[in-house]
Regions:
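Generic structural signal for well-ordered, non-transmembrane alpha-helical segments
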Residues: 1, 5, 22, 51-55, ...
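A short secondary-structure junction motif
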Residues: 60, 64, 93-96, 100, ...
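Long amphipathic all-alpha helical oligomerization modules
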Residues: 79, 83, 87-111
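Acidic, carboxylate-rich catalytic segments that either coordinate divalent cations
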Residues: 104-145
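Residue-level detector of solvent-exposed, low-hydrophobicity positions
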Residues: 33, 59, 85-86, 103, ...
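General N-terminal targeting signals
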Residues: 48, 70, 95-96, 114, ...
Length: 145
């Protein structure tokens, strides 16, 4: 919310999710359903995308600070915290999986969970690109002025 506040978006509008891209809403709902319905070890495995978060966040923080004068360190605080939190989260998840995914079948299901999460993330990126780079914003989704 700090980032959307900085962007000048109305907080009630943001939290209502009225302007969310349909693909983003669908992807988030699919991911939540996935982690609720799967065995704990598989749900935890899906979080291993966090292994790559620090390098991605470092790049995004630098880009945002360099290219947008309205973005400052306070706005980037969440992402900066993730630089140290994400490796701890991923390390915990990896140890949990190594301890609890005892069969080949369970280990393969854990790998599939990471693939699923990557697909969820790609679906969101595709939707963002189509809407805000190609200009094909779906009806009802946020449309920058």
């Amino acid at each position: 919310l700090v980032l959307t506040d900085c962007l000048g978006l109305d907080r009630e509008y943001v939290t209502s999710m009225r302007g969310a891209l349909p693909a983003t809403r669908f992807a988030v709902e699919a991911y939540v359903r996935f982690v609720v319905e799967q065995p704990l070890v598989i749900a935890v495995a899906s979080s291993l995308t966090e292994l790559f978060a620090p390098s991605i966040h470092r790049e995004r923080i630098a880009g945002m600070l360099a290219n947008y004068d309205f973005v400052n360190d306070d706005v980037m605080a969440y992402f900066k915290r993730r630089l140290s939190q994400a490796p701890r989260d991923a390390s915990f998840a990896l140890e949990f999986i190594k301890t609890n995914a005892r069969t080949r079948e369970m280990q393969e299901a854990c790998v599939d969970a990471v693939r699923f999460k990557c697909n969820v993330l790609w679906a969101q990126l595709d939707a963002l690109y189509l809407a805000y780079v190609q200009g094909m914003v779906p009806p009802g989704a946020y449309k920058p002025e």
